């Protein structure tokens, strides 16, 4: 029989587990951030231990920073603002969540944010409603308030395709989670916009020699390049000679293999190996397990589906989890 782990406040709009899975952050319609944790290490029941108002508008996304940078979360709000909050000790008051950094662009809204650890620093990638991507670098690992803009560009392969000011409903960013010390950081980015050039999923890799980001692959068949993308997820890689990335559009979930050896032009070979269907409506979110072997997806139909491939590389639906009426 299923057991409830936590009861979230009514009006909860999003949630996110930290890397160790012992704390849950939840955002609400009223702009409040709530932190849930268990009272003991052996308990599987979580209760709210902290609550702070982040914004006057609703929180639409929460992302935990990598654990080596402390207990901190980034919140994206409906008004397009982005803020970073850190749990700090305040003398007699004990631990409290404090605002470290707030960002708001007058002309565009933040749609998604993700963090990636490079060999030199922590990087933050923020995707905006005007189709631009901004990469920020943390200047001091001990101070989450000091971020420097490192790069700014649109999600297009060549400069001739650079657009004026498109309108984007959503964006999705997913970092390559298993980059080694000797490898450059990379991530995949896609949009759900009115501009076909922006939408398709593109892998961006940092070129340290020239201090710039380069598009090294595009995850879309020729007939699908203009399709809006709803969600992305880059799988952890444990010993595979290729990377695996999941891309969700209105046509379903595409599973892509990305080669590790670039061609003479610096592009990585890509191949779509499977198309998964089963959700009745849009796919909103996808996550891989730690092994990169099982993909979980959820969407507007309220279902959670688990997908796996067999030894022959054929993908299939492994399980479906339905919401339980309250």
Swiss-Prot record:
GO CC annotation terms, alphabetical: cytoplasm; nuclear envelope; nuclear pore
Listed GO biological process terms: mRNA transport; protein transport
GO MF assignments: structural molecule activity
Domain of life (superkingdom): Eukaryota
Statement: the UniProt record of this protein carries the keyword Protein transport: yes
Subcellular location: Nucleus envelope; Nucleus; Cytoplasm; Nucleus, Nuclear pore complex
Null mutant phenotype: No visible phenotype, but enhanced susceptibility to virulent Pseudomonas bacteria and oomycete pathogens.
UniProt keyword annotations, A-Z: Cytoplasm, mRNA transport, Nuclear pore complex, Nucleus, Protein transport, Repeat, Translocation, Transport, WD repeat
UniProt main location, coarse: nucleus
Gene3D superfamilies xref list: YVTN repeat-like/Quinoprotein amine dehydrogenase
Pfam families for this protein: WD40
Placement of WD repeats on the sequence: 7-46, 54-95, 105-146, 224-266, 278-317
Protein family: Belongs to the WD repeat SEC13 family.
Subunit details: Part of the nuclear pore complex (NPC). The NPC has an eight-fold symmetrical structure comprising a central transport channel and two rings, the cytoplasmic and nuclear rings, to which eight filaments are attached. The cytoplasmic filaments have loose ends, while the nuclear filaments are joined in a distal ring, forming a nuclear basket. NPCs are highly dynamic in configuration and composition, and can be devided in 3 subcomplexes, the NUP62 subcomplex, the NUP107-160 subcomplex and the NUP93 subcomplex, containing approximately 30 different nucleoporin proteins.
Function: Required for proper export of mRNAs from the nucleus to the cytoplasm.
PANTHER family: NUCLEAR PORE COMPLEX PROTEIN SEC13 / SEH1 FAMILY MEMBER (PTHR11024), NUCLEOPORIN SEH1 (PTHR11024:SF3)
Protein name: Protein SEH1
Gene transcribed to yield this protein: SEH1
């Amino acid at each position: 029989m299923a057991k409830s782990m936590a009861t979230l406040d009514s009006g909860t709009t999003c949630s996110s587990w930290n890397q160790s899975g012992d704390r849950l952050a939840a955002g609400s319609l009223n702009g409040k951030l709530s932190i849930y944790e268990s009272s003991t290490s052996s308990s599987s029941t979580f209760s709210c231990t902290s609550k702070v108002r982040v914004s006057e508008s609703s929180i639409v996304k929460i992302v935990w920073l990598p654990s080596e940078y402390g207990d901190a979360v980034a919140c994206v709000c409906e008004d397009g603002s982005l803020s970073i909050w850190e749990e700090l000790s305040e003398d007699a008051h004990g631990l409290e969540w404090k605002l470290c950094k707030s960002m708001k662009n007058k002309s565009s809204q933040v749609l998604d944010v993700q963090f990636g650890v490079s060999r030199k620093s922590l990087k933050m990638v923020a995707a905006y409603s005007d189709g631009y991507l901004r990469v920020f670098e943390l200047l001091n690992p001990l101070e989450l308030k000091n971020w420097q803009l490192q790069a700014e560009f649109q999600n297009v392969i060549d400069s001739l395709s650079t657009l004026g000011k498109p309108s984007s409903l959503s964006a999705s960013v997913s970092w390559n989670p298993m980059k080694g010390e000797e490898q450059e950081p990379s991530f995949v980015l896609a949009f759900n916009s009115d501009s076909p050039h922006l939408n398709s999923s593109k892998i961006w890799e940092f070129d340290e020699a020239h201090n710039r980001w380069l598009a090294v692959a595009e995850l879309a068949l020729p007939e699908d390049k203009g399709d809006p993308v709803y969600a992305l997820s880059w799988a952890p890689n444990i010993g595979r000679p290729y990377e695996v990335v999941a891309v969700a559009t209105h046509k379903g979930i595409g599973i892509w293999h990305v080669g590790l050896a670039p061609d003479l032009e610096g592009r990585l070979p890509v191949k779509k190996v499977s198309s998964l269907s089963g959700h009745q409506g849009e796919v909103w979110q996808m996550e891989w397990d730690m092994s990169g072997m099982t993909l979980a997806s959820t969407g507007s139909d309220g279902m959670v589906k688990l997908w796996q491939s067999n030894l022959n590389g054929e993908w299939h639906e492994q399980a479906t989890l339905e919401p339980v009426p309250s």
